[in-house]
């Protein structure tokens, strides 16, 4: 809970500063990259959360990983976090920043699940389907062979399930109802 509040505040401040200085999109790209690095490297997360590792060593690690590769605002945030002994929440801040960025920009996340990778035409069709629900859409593609075919679209609390397994289950339920009612 405490980490969430801290992450929210730092992310909000960074969004405000980046927007004021016209570097919001660059900083968002940086935060996405930072989140990706932390997701892929659990040892990095462990080091950042380890109270035994000194702050200057953590700063050196962050500098080596991101120095010269991210915007000055982003690097300043990372430096500030190590000075304030908040490096343990870098991952949470990057995730929260992206959530707030999407909210600010009116971008909705749409999860599309299929049995195989989708084509550009299909991607455009899925975006068109969701265009009535949101002006800007970010697709997250997932592969799940359990749906047997078709697709499942999820946005917020809405779901469009056009999968083969859902249709088979619907037929099964109708058949079961008819047998019971017979």
From Swiss-Prot:
Membrane topology category: Peripheral membrane protein
Cross-referenced Pfam families: OSCP (PF00213)
InterPro entries documented for this protein: ATP_synth_OSCP/delta_N_sf, ATPase_OSCP/dsu
Subcellular location(s) of the protein: Cell inner membrane
UniProt-listed SUPFAM superfamilies: N-terminal domain of the delta subunit of the F1F0-ATP synthase
Function (record text): F(1)F(0) ATP synthase produces ATP from ADP in the presence of a proton or sodium gradient. F-type ATPases consist of two structural domains, F(1) containing the extramembraneous catalytic core and F(0) containing the membrane proton channel, linked together by a central stalk and a peripheral stalk. During catalysis, ATP synthesis in the catalytic domain of F(1) is coupled via a rotary mechanism of the central stalk subunits to proton translocation.
Quaternary context: F-type ATPases have 2 components, F(1) - the catalytic core - and F(0) - the membrane proton channel. F(1) has five subunits: alpha(3), beta(3), gamma(1), delta(1), epsilon(1). F(0) has three main subunits: a(1), b(2) and c(10-14). The alpha and beta chains form an alternating ring which encloses part of the gamma chain. F(1) is attached to F(0) by a central stalk formed by the gamma and epsilon chains, while a peripheral stalk is formed by the delta and b chains.
Family label: Belongs to the ATPase delta chain family.
Protein name per its UniProtKB record: ATP synthase subunit delta
Provenance organism: Cytophaga hutchinsonii (strain ATCC 33406 / DSM 1761 / CIP 103989 / NBRC 15051 / NCIMB 9469 / D465)
């Amino acid at each position: 809970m405490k980490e969430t509040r801290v992450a929210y505040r730092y992310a909000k401040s960074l969004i405000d500063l980046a927007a004021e200085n016209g570097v919001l999109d660059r900083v968002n790209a940086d935060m996405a990259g930072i989140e990706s690095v932390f997701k892929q490297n659990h040892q990095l997360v462990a080091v950042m959360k380890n109270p035994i590792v000194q702050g200057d060593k953590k700063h050196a690690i962050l500098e080596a990983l991101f120095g010269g590769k991210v915007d000055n605002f982003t690097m300043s945030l990372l430096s500030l976090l190590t000075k304030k002994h908040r490096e343990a929440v870098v991952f949470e801040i990057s995730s929260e920043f992206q959530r707030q960025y999407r909210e600010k920009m009116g971008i909705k996340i749409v999860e599309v699940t299929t049995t195989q990778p989708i084509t550009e035409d299909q991607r455009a069709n899925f975006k068109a389907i969701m265009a009535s629900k949101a002006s800007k859409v970010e697709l997250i593609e997932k592969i799940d062979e359990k749906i047997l075919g078709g697709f499942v679209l999820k946005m917020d609390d809405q779901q469009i399930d056009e999968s083969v397994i859902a249709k088979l289950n619907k037929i099964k339920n109708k058949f079961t109802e008819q047998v019971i009612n017979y």
